[in-house]
């Protein structure tokens, strides 16, 4: 894995042995709305402020050497929010992707997209696909943008795919195991989640990477997402490195 030389604003990452780092970190970026409410601002201002946190955490992940990072950007349940907020979120996400992809490319980040295209619109889907294409040869880190993503739907889609192959005679029902199911997930080349991290003090998983997080270490941090920075991310990595993982044993 290549670590690119970038201006890291003078921040030195903690020394964490590579063997003690999580390979795959999944992050629920929660608290934008509450951040705005605390300041008597419209909710969309919280989402705008969250962009800086996202960029800083991605920078910190590359800097310290985390190879896989998944960010929960927009869930399938987010469609239930107020229509004006949903429209803003989709438009803002499109703009952030277009605005930041050259920076990610410069950092050596490969951007991937997990989710379904339904209802996203052709322009946003094109931005996602273009970004995947532009960054596909990058090797510093794999960034999984989870947009219009829901873990239960991902599992349902995987099961449907397996059932179709069984009915077509391509595989036998007896051969179906965990590895086959994992290979039908949206990102089959990503390892299972080692560290599941959530901001804002909420202690729940919210339908994010349920299959992949079966044996993940869970860390819930109180800071709201717009205030979250790479130092907070590194603090979570240090906490993870001090844990003894059991993998269900």
UniProtKB/Swiss-Prot annotation:
Keywords: Magnesium, Metal-binding, Transferase. Substrate binds at residues 31-35, 43, 47, 75-77, 79, 81, 198, 204-206. Gene3D superfamilies: Decaprenyl diphosphate synthase-like. Mg(2+) binds at residues 30, 217. Disulfide bonds: none annotated. Binds 2 magnesium ions per subunit. The keyword Membrane does not apply. GO terms for molecular function: ditrans,polycis-undecaprenyl-diphosphate synthase [(2E,6E)-farnesyl-diphosphate specific] activity; magnesium ion binding; manganese ion binding; Z-farnesyl diphosphate synthase activity. GO terms for biological process: polyprenol biosynthetic process. The keyword Disulfide bond does not apply. The active site is at 30, 78 (proton acceptor). PROSITE patterns: UPP_SYNTHASE. Its cofactor is Mg(2+). Its EC number is 2.5.1.-. One of its GO terms (cellular component) is plasma membrane. It is an enzyme of class 2 (transferase). Belongs to the UPP synthase family. Catalyzes the condensation of isopentenyl diphosphate (IPP) with allylic pyrophosphates generating different type of terpenoids. Homodimer. NCBIfam families: PRK14829.1, uppS. This is Isoprenyl transferase 1. It comes from Tropheryma whipplei (strain Twist). The gene is uppS1.
